[in-house]
Amino acid sequence: MKKENQAALILEGGGNRGVFTAGVLDYLMEQNTEFSYVTGVSAGACNAVDFVSKQRGRTRQCMILEDKEYSYISMGNMIKNRSLFDMDMLFDRYPNEIFPFDFDTYFQSNTECELVVTNCNTGEAEYLSEKEDRQKLMNICRASSSLPVVSPMVELDGEMYLDGGIADSIPVIHAMKKGYRKNVVILTRNYGYRKEKPGKSKALYVAAFREYPNLLNTLLNRYRNYNRTLDLIEKWEKEGHIFVIRPEMEPVGRAERDEEKLAAFYQHGYDLMKEKITDMETYLKQDNED
């Protein structure tokens, strides 16, 4: 089914590189820009729910912390909870206490929002949505953001899940299969970036996931799938079929904690979207062609 007059927003992950996406989305929220469909992966899932709940500035607050007491990245946490990131802080204390998430606005939104997770048994991507249960929504976000090896698996309805980026890092093809003809893609890497074949990480994956052969296969081939998707994105972008926003400065690292670097990358996203808003609006208004 074609959705001629509707547009999709696709958000890549990348840990704290998601602060770039936060800048892009904060500007879009200032302009009251809405999309019929939003999908996000890993950190992009967190961006996605904040966009649908219309909480301008929330993702920035979560990523650029003024109070170090609420930091969610530490090696101590890796030893204590087998996770580099404090997932309880991120998906329990943040939304319920520290940076309250507006569940009511999110649940009442007409925007369809799907968050990408990877099923550990099948090794395939699943696209989950939740518009009623607060805890389940945050658990889906947690699963979508749970990196292999450095985060434990997350159980949802009896199945085990990990980071959505393992199986589908940039779900633009999924959005197209759902019928969306206008797709705005927010990437967190520069033009021309490609992933390399697993090196030392291969041994870690084999040791950690030998009981999950389908997941292991997806992990070892992730670079191929990711690079193939980027090849298509660059082709479709050149042909005018999709609209892409990506960093034009050096991205920060996945676990970057330097406030100045994070703030600069956030501002870059904001300024870039402001610069390109007219081009995006023109793209969205263009007639669709078969």
Question: What is each residue range found by the language model?
Answer:
Residues M1-V41, V49-D290:
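Patatin-like phospholipase
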